[in-house]
Each structure stands twice: as structure tokens, then as C-alpha cells.
Amino acid sequence: MIFAALLTGCAALPDTSPEQVALPYVHTFSANTASNNLPTGWRPWGVNRFKRPTEYRLIQEDGRTIVRARATASASGLIHPLDLDPSVYRLLHWHWKVDELIAKADNTQKHTEDSPVRLVISFDGDMEKLDFGDRMFFDQVKAFTGQQLPYATLMYIWENRAAKGTVIANRHSSRIKMVVAESGREKLGAWQEQTHDIYADFRRAFGEEPGRITAIGIMTDTDNTGENVHAYYGDITFKRIARPRSVVDGD
């Protein structure tokens, strides 16, 4: 998938609706009903008009509302604008479930860069720090789409082979990195709970301090491999790291 076109959705978010205003929290999927077309606070996030979109639908499972994604040689997502300090809200917590892997997917290769589930987080930053190659790439994206890429993008993915914790550099830009949150077939078909220190992961991936978080997205994509996949997303939340209690606190 050409992330250049897709990720512009993280940068230039319209502010014509209350649901599209950057917030200091994420609207939960479970607060919705399955009859809603889209979860509150989220909007469609497309690649381009020539790409088939992935289908996202709110459904009920075991009494809670979740998002089901169905990809058929497709790529698109849902995005939620944010305004968060990752040094304060360091912990990113979510649930996801994958029924089957994408057999041909390999995120280390640009022609097979698909994943059954992705969490995509965009960060603000000083564009003057971009190197020449990234400046050229960002300029090309802006010329093609009319929108500006975020300064940095960090993804959490489910990979076929790469080990958990591996950081994979995007083949198009050094400002897009993928962290392997889950790998292989062992945990297919069951809900998986994930918690990651996004502040630490950003520093490990980019070698610098993160700027403010400007958006989060979910994405299931199979446009490169042409395969079919179903996946499920539960609530996504950002949390503070609990401060250890001390004698001074009275405990």
C-alpha cells in the first residue's frame, strides 16, 4: 500500500463537525450501538479513489459493540483526531482479534506491505528537521493529495514472521515506522489485549522525543497481496503510567 496517500488523513482534519475536533481522549467503540453507521468521533480514512475501501461495521459480540473490518484486495481505515501529550499519556491500550493471517504479507517488502490489523498514530513535530529525502517525499505527497503528511507516524501491526517488538522502517519514508505488536498464528481467533508504552516505542523507533499526538487510526489492508481477511477492533484508550505510592501519600 502507498502509505503516502493514506496517511495524509492523519494531518489535515476538517473541523466542520464536533466529531472531527481534536480531543484529549478517544471515543470508545463500546459506547456505540451496532445500528450506528460509524463510531462516534471516527471518520472514514481513504487511500485514494482508485483503491477499494475496506469495510468497517459496528457489530455486537458478547454484549459489547466492536468494529469488524473486512478487506478484499482493499485498503482504508477509520481515523480519530486527537491532541495528547505522549509523555503524560504514555500507555496505549487496546484489544483486537484476527481470524486468519494474510498469507503473502511481509511488511519488510513494499510490494507485500499488508496487515490484518493496524493501529496508526500520528505525531506533530518540527518539519524543518526533515532530511532532504523526506522533504522531497512529503512535497510529492502534498502535490498529489493537497494535504500534508504528519511529522511522524508510528504503527502497531500483526506480522506473519517478524518477531514481536521488531521495528520495521517504511520503504517510502524514514518518518513512518511499524512496531510488531503480535506475530504468527498462535493467537489467531481469540481476542488479544495489548498495552504499549508509546513514548518509549517512539524514542526507540525514531531516536528522538515525540511531539504531541494528533490522530489515531485503525486499518486493515490487503491491497498489495489481493487477499481477503476479517479482523476485529475493541476499545482503544491512552492511559497515564501509575505513580508509585509512597509513605508521603499516606499509604
Language model segments and positions:
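Bacterial N-terminal signal peptides
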Residues: 1-9
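Extracellular/lumenal carbohydrate-interaction signature centered on repeated Trp-anchored short motifs
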Residues: 81-92, 185-188
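Extracellular beta-strand ligand-recognition surfaces/modules
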Residues: 117-119, 174-184, 188-226
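Extracellular carbohydrate-recognition regions
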Residues: 11-47, 132-139, 248-251
